[in-house]
Amino acid sequence: GISLFYNLGKGKFKEKKLLQFSPVFGASYFELADFNNDGYPDIVLTNGDNWDYSRTNKNYHGIRIYLNDGKYNFQEQWFFPLYGTAKAIVRDFDNDGDPDIAAIAFYDILEKPSNGFVYFSNEGNFHFKPSSLPNAALGKWLTMEAGDFDHDGDTDIVLGSYFHNIEEMRSLIGTVDILSFPQLL
């Protein structure tokens, strides 16, 4: 789950539980962003950690947006199913003034490599247009960060890949030269 700890001073804190989930929910990452411009942070949460209890795909894994009512009570507003979702980063990637989402999924990657990295362009009113990059299908993305890495004034995304072994790498990239697949994109 997710909790907020209020600092009472002198090393004392008061906990407020914001969201609670069962252990098989597979929560993997969360980030705060204001999706409805009300001045309160909303929660973007990914759940796709699939190796703790069961390795089967679960239809409840994906990306969720929970809206803050202003009193730090949260209700789910949006859900996109994506098996093995590991992380979602929120930024205005297309510089149009609203928050977009970039997400990576790890465990279902051998069956659907195009789902390893998905970009969601915010179309307004909690409608997000998903898209993927052809080169992103060549990696097994386990980590992702965003920032202006090339110092050109816009937000860039860096993806880091992980493979258990050479056979897993070969099964994902097929006939492509093993030395040419991206470890970083």
Q: Locations of the language-model features?
A:
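Beta-propeller-forming repeat regions
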Residues: 1-185
